[in-house]
Swiss-Prot record:
Organism domain of life: Archaea
Reaction(s) catalysed (UniProt annotation): Release of an N-terminal pyroglutamyl group from a polypeptide, the second amino acid generally not being Pro
Keywords of the record: Cytoplasm, Disulfide bond, Hydrolase, Protease, Thiol protease
Pfam families: Peptidase_C15
Protein name: Pyrrolidone-carboxylate peptidase
Recorded family membership: Belongs to the peptidase C15 family.
Gene that this polypeptide is encoded by: pcp
GO biological process: proteolysis
Gene3D superfamilies xrefs: Peptidase C15, pyroglutamyl peptidase I-like
Active-site residues, record numbering mapped to chain: E79, C142, H166
């Protein structure tokens, strides 16, 4: 079995992105009999698609779990659905701000995650990790990557399972925000990393 985990480079003025660390820390490890491949995607429309599709074609993973940062969220959020739309609130890392455009013209309006999202949430709760099912992955790069991965599954037959998980800020990202209005929530990096490992374990159990 092969599992792909993707994260993103920093964006929106942030110096770090915990999902970049997650992808790098999981790259090369084994969970059960599965080999994990971690890759970091650019926060750039077009380029992210190129890197993602090339990675999927090279690795041909059985499972793809894409991870993104969701500033303001206080728990692990497991995304239910990706929609065929881009409506960026902020520019990407090359200054492009795409609004009201489809991700794949003529493709389905939306795809549901093929990960066992309720089982993942239940297992996270058992491990003491706060998590919930989210019904919106936004309309930026996270939804973009989730949609493209599921579209690849639908048209190419792999990965067999694909979905997206959002994580909150980590504490070190909050320091420079203190004294500048309401301090956003955060979660320790170790818990976020463990959450992704749990998601992999549950997905693997579902496929076996």
């Amino acid at each position: 079995m092969k599992v792909l985990v993707t994260g993103f480079e920093p964006f929106g003025g942030e110096k770090i992105n915990p999902t970049e660390r997650i992808a790098k820390d999981l790259d090369g490890i084994k969970i059960g009999d599965a080999q994990v491949f971690g890759r970091v995607l650019p926060v750039v429309f077009g380029k992210a698609k190129e890197v993602l599709e090339k990675t999927l074609e090279e690795i041909k993973p059985d499972i793809a779990i894409h991870v993104g940062l969701a500033p303001g969220r206080s728990a692990i959020s497991i995304e239910r659905i990706a929609v065929n739309a881009i409506d960026a609130r902020i520019p990407d890392n090359e200054g492009k701000k795409i609004e009201d455009e489809p991700i794949v013209p003529g493709a389905p309006t939306a795809y549901f995650s093929t990960l066992p999202i309720k089982k993942i949430m239940k297992k996270l709760h058992e491990r003491g990790i706060p998590a919930y099912i989210s019904n919106s992955a936004g309309l930026y790069l996270c939804n973009y990557v989730m949609y493209l991965s599921l579209h690849h599954s639908a048209t190419k037959g792999y990965p067999k399972m694909s979905g997206f998980i959002h994580v909150p800020y980590i504490p070190e990202q909050i320091i420079d925000k203190i004294g500048k209005g309401q301090v956003p929530p955060s979660m320790c990096y170790e818990m976020e990393l463990e959450a992704v490992k749990v998601a992999i374990e549950v997905a693997l159990e579902e496929l076996l």
